Amino acid sequence: MAHLTCVKADEAKLAEVLGQLQGFGVKNILALRGDIPADMQGEEIGSFAHASELMRFVKQQGDFCVGGAAYPEGHPESGSLEQDIENTKYKVDAGVDFLVTQMFFDNTILYNYMFRLLRAGINVPVVPGIMPVTNAKQIIRICQLSGTKLPPQFRAMVEKFADKPEALKQAGIAYATGQIIDLIANGFDNVHIYTMNKPEIFAGIMNNLGEIVDK
């Protein structure tokens, strides 16, 4: 699945990239706005100010299956979760085919979010995003930037193994595995694992799941 961001992008360049992707047989696109630098304003942002605008453009360029981001705890720039869900509706109206969520460490947050989406009339498939923790400082920093809550049991795990990288990696894999098992048990058929370019993390989780995902 190709990832596209639209900060500083122009329509001509994106059309060229999408044409190349079509030529390679790529069908699935994850369309994201991307982070806007603090010193960037106005026309510097490019042709697209919002992810929904990028999604609509991609749909116009070819027969792509387009995914977008969803935020179970709200986007950091949104004033409230309700406002963020309204922004998610714009993505659906723009033709998004599925949503991939920001990381979360408490599945209850996702289940409550799903209820809110359905109540708002949003019923496109939602793929939960799971991030196994492998670095204590990194995960705390990411959570601070994204507004992701750290449940007590997760925080205790990170603090306990913060100075033991291999132990933290094993604990992170175990915690993520537990999240995924619970998601599968509650009807989710797909998850997106944020491995941070560490394929051994994915391998460890799949080894733990074993027969649970064996078709």
Identify what each model region corresponds to.
Residues 3-9, 32-36, 69-75, 104-105, ...:
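Active-site beta-loop-alpha junctions enriched in small/polar residues
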Residues 9-18, 35-58, 78-82, 103-119, ...:
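Active-site-adjacent beta->alpha loops and helix N-cap segments on the catalytic face
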Residues 11-19, 79-90, 172-182:
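Short, acidic/polar
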Residues 21, 91, 95, 128, ...:
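Conserved, mostly hydrophobic/aromatic
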Residues 25-27, 62-66, 96-97, 122-126, ...:
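Short, well-ordered coil/turn segments that N-cap beta-strands
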Residues 45-71, 119-173, 178, 209-215:
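Active-site pocket-lining/capping segments in soluble small-molecule metabolic enzymes
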Residues 61-97, 105:
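Ligand/cofactor pocket segment of small-molecule handling proteins
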